[in-house]
From Swiss-Prot:
The gene is aaeX. It is found in: Cell membrane. The chain crosses the membrane at residues 3-23, 43-63. Keywords: Cell membrane, Membrane, Transmembrane, Transmembrane helix. It holds the Pfam family DUF1656. This is Protein AaeX. InterPro entries: DUF1656. One of its GO terms (cellular component) is plasma membrane. It comes from Citrobacter koseri (strain ATCC BAA-895 / CDC 4225-83 / SGSC4696). It comes from the Bacteria.
C-alpha cells in the first residue's frame, strides 16, 4: 500500500505509481545525460539493454522510498 492517495487531475485519476514512474524517468534522463560524456557506453555491449536495466534499478529505488 502506497502512502499517497489516488490523484485526480482534470477528471483523470492517476495511481501513485504513475508519479513514481515519472520521477524515475526524470532521474534516468539526468543520469544518462551524465553517463554519455564519460564514455561508459563504449564499454557497454548492448546500450538499449543497459538503459532498460538502469531505468528498472532507478524505479526500484524510487518505489522503495515511497513504500
Amino acid at each position: 500500500m502506497s502512502l499517497f492517495p489516488v490523484i485526480v487531475v482534470f477528471g483523470l485519476s492517476f495511481p501513485p505509481i504513475f508519479f513514481e514512474l515519472l520521477l524515475s524517468l526524470a532521474i534516468f534522463w539526468l543520469v544518462r545525460r551524465m553517463l554519455v560524456p564519460t564514455g561508459i557506453y563504449d564499454f557497454v555491449w548492448h546500450p538499449a539493454l543497459f538503459n532498460t536495466a538502469l531505468y528498472c534499478c532507478l524505479f526500484y529505488l524510487i518505489s522503495r522510498l515511497f513504500v
